[in-house]
Amino acid sequence: MNTRINRRTLTLIPRFLVLGSLLLLCSKVAGQQMYQLTQFMLNNYTVNPAVVGTHNYFQARTNHRFQWVGMNDAPITNVVSVYGPLTKSPMGFGALFYNDITGPTSRTGLVGSYAYNIALTDEIRISAGLSVGFMAFRVDASKFDLGDNTNYATDPALLTFQSKTSIVPDAAVGVYMYASHYYVGASCQQLIGNTLTLYGHPVRENALRRSFYAHGGYLIYLSENFDLEPSVIVKWSPPSPFQFDLNVKATYLTRVWAGISYRHLDAVSFMIGYRHDNRILFGYSFDFSYTRLRAYTGGSHELMIGYQFDKLK
């Protein structure tokens, strides 16, 4: 009798390990569900759909982030966006794709955006925007490693544990007020707040919680060749605490820039970038964590590449 109980317990151990790992990953994602970019100020569309149509040209941006380099299964994020105005109309549209991977879990999303802007004064305009699309949350069972003695092909506890994907609709809204030398905006991501369903059960611990953003920046002309742009972003995803980034970016001849950023309770970042022929942009940032993570990671790297199309007439 005791032997049977022990064998059954041993058989169930791999399943408990898998489910425990999944719950830990879910709790991690719940704390930081939205992807994180250090160079957000170079592409505010990633945090606010109202930004589309606020420039008189189309632009494309790609961001590639490698977070906590040196740690196993650390997050890797890729974002691609294209957006711009509708010719001779106070509106714009765009599309954004992202893929955010953390160990055996990944979040992939695609949204289309529309925004309409009006003039408040001769200098100031305000835009309201909406994004609608989908998000796919995937658990890749092949990336779980339970040790050399586990037979994934024949173990009855693992036969039913396979890769699963939960696809849900997603949406975001935002407002954005801007002038030639400053901007301020607010948005809500994951507006619908869906609950993911995996293995036939809703994973309520990993419900898509609404995330609120407030961001702004101010351009200061120091001289004919130099300008300075401080910016800030505040993020809140209840019940998680507020988080904010403070940034300062200095630009020379509108071509070369360097900056520093402070992320509350997380990291200090350094940024450099170059604009070629007023069309192609290259940006790089490095995050140095000042938390306990600094003992286990070599920092976070992020690369941004952009292209600016001709101005619309």
Predicted feature locations:
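Bacterial Sec-dependent N-terminal signal peptides
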Residues: M1-Q36, V248, G299, F309-K313
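Subset of outer-membrane beta-barrel
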Residues: Q32-K313
